[in-house]
């Protein structure tokens, strides 16, 4: 650990010393969980199908026990999960291979980016009887508004421990979380939140006003005491307390943390969701009575009264909106929400919290949501479109001498990613605008590279007619087999606009009764990932949308790679028969085994 400067934080040093080795964590890992007590020797030898099956089954048991109110059984199953060797192996994989910050070290400077280092990490953690929580390393990343967002990066061992703890704690809370919470939860996404906005604010609903709420520094200010009270006396509670109180090191100076959960920790989003859970239940206590008549002339006969919630609610992490029929209803709920947040150490950001008419629109998760002639429109946010185009301009300006092929290779995934995010909204007109702007940007870039040449010469060099489309910015590329073909800039207008199918109410992947529902849902998403009839679609269909290494669904949230069964340099082809889709971590495992052979 880096030395701490000056003596003004003596109490902080003492706090670190108190965190050194006080919490039992992984002692007595059961031998029948993996079948052996021998130390792990080879990362590539792990049977991920078996490992994931064991962890999934245990998560489902915790979920069902929570649903049934069997709290002693929940505690016992949580203890079993914390001792599970399979959970440890899967947690190491997620912290060192699947997590976006896998290559970022904590204050100890350690990472585990190779199979050998992962094996050493597993064997080291496996022998621990007392856990040593270390402070996080403070780093900053830029925000969209130009400010800096602070992150707290735990050590790699703490990240693994947090992943282990998350698998024990998360399924129990998944059985209790409110239905309209969509952020940082398994099987849920931004698009589910946007689709719920669309469903709530369509012409059948009479809500005309929205509270567009912003919580001031939610992750940094959540009350530790409230989180600990909310999770109760569960196994590993003291370890969670240590993570909350661990502090952080910035410029070799230790700082205490008296509130908040560090952004950068694997368990932090779950703890934030636990703290913010309950707004939906709070609002459900306010209802309105609606009277239905059998016919307009029979108002005194056959009347039906129905209690309806006065408010609509959608939350994604710390961003949420509340809808109601009148402005008075919205203004009346604000003081109640403020009091509710204050109990958690939080407050609304008055500058960014707005009360607006739905007809005027509001921004939420990158979309502008607005009622127009009785319909709810979800349009790409103007500021996001500008920022996207500006990013392309800046990159081309900085790469004026880059080849056409490199430009296409860099821009196409970015353009396709932007389109895939917004394809579930009212985006066709915006897509057309962006395509035309990108064409203009590339035309100016092409001209600037050859100031002494005429426009006709530039057009012949950079533009082709492809599939009857004229003036396509393109380049002739050679594949690994020496075959030449023309590659063009991807067009957003080629993306099919289709509504996202929202997740059902409280549905969770941990519910064993919904296994088929989640499999079908993942397959439905996969069928929109590749064009139907394409080579990659056929490959996925042939392998029944499952990774052939770990047995999990291809679209379980992990990054995908396409593997050649027979390498191209050994005579293999790029045809569907020689390809198989794998999760990125599974793909690396295959390449670590020289003799690995996959079935079709």
Where are these regions (language model features)?
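Acidic catalytic cores of enzymes that act on phosphate-bearing nucleotides/polynucleotides
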Residues: 444-446, 453-526
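Non-catalytic, peripheral interaction segments enriched in hydrophobic/basic residues
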Residues: 403, 407-464
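Short, charged surface segments at domain edges that flank catalytic/cofactor-binding sites
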Residues: 507-549, 573
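Non-catalytic, polymerase-adjacent accessory regions of viral genome-replication enzymes
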Residues: 1-119
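A conserved non-catalytic segment of reverse transcriptases
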Residues: 245, 251-254, 344-418
